[in-house]
Amino acid sequence: MQSFWLIFQLLICLALGFVLARRLPKWLERLSFQILPYFTYILLIAIAIEFSTTLHSIAEPWQILNHAALLAVMTSIGAFVCCYVLFKLLGYQPSHGKVSMSLVSKSLINISYAFIALALGYGLAELSSGFGYTLHISTWNLLLVFMFLIGLDLAYSPLDRSWLNWQILLVPLGCILGSIIGAFVTGYFVPSIQLKDLIMLSQGYGFYSMTGIVVTELKNAHLGSIALMNDLFREIFAIVFMYIIGWRYPRSAISSAGATAMDVTLPMVKQACGNDFIPHAMVSGFILSVLAPIVVSVLAAL
């Protein structure tokens, strides 16, 4: 029952943000949108503080990185291949395009900020522990605020009804199915983690600031750490895929980008794939951003 109460809180905050958009005072809306880009880093600092105690209790903490990296590789490739097969069956042909190294560098620098935030949080936790004081920040309450801000942001996303055709919906479908297939493959190499937990971890779609906290609350801190690192790695792989093969297989690259397609990797979609594929990225990113907290929470509660 507690699990469903936590899921309900997430959905209520997301829905409140969506419904209250354009109804809040203008100054408060402006403040919310100014805070949103930096709120992720605040969350990551808080997550690192919370997970620092977990790392001390784990005999081989490098296993977290190994398992997360393997799962991220398999789910990213799974999403790419699954989307490719779906569109290949419809007779779609590869595209042509290009991407600049400057855009790739800028995207990777933005990803590095996330790792810096994690390192800062871990450093603060270790420093305070050295002075005999234990830092504690409620990551769950921060996540609820973040979900409200995400709801506001989604309400202002420029989605056009003409974009909602069944071909575009195959992009997020490919991500969902491919991620599940990737979890099955990972299960063969990582028998120490139950298959149902790997499937749950695979459904974060790169939404790292949410999955780590939700999985920690509903399962345990060990799986929460894997969830966080898995989705961080997925975001990195999304950028790499978009650069290497996004210009040739845009729909598949967008699918592997998961929830990041409507924010972090969107500039690369625009340049590498062209404006024709912006609707694919926006619709897929929107759907997966909404589904991620719901699916992960439900699977974690089972």
What kind of feature is each model-predicted range?
Residues 3-14, 57-82, 110, 114, ...:
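Entry/N-cap segments of selected transmembrane alpha helices
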Residues 1-23, 30, 42:
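N-terminal signal-anchor module of multipass membrane proteins
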Residues 18-22, 26, 67-97, 170-215, ...:
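Transmembrane alpha-helices that form the ion-translocation and gating core
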Residues 2-15, 36-37, 67-78, 133-147, ...:
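Structural signature of hydrophobic alpha-helical transmembrane segments
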Residues 4, 25-36, 52-69, 89-107, ...:
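Interfacial helix-loop-helix linkers and transmembrane-helix boundary segments
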Residues 48, 53, 197-237, 249-283:
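Alpha-helical membrane segments and immediately flanking helix-loop junctions
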Residues 13-21, 36-61, 120-125, 139-162, ...:
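Hydrophobic transmembrane alpha-helices of secondary-active transporters
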Residues 293-302:
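Juxtamembrane boundary at the C-terminal end of a transmembrane helix
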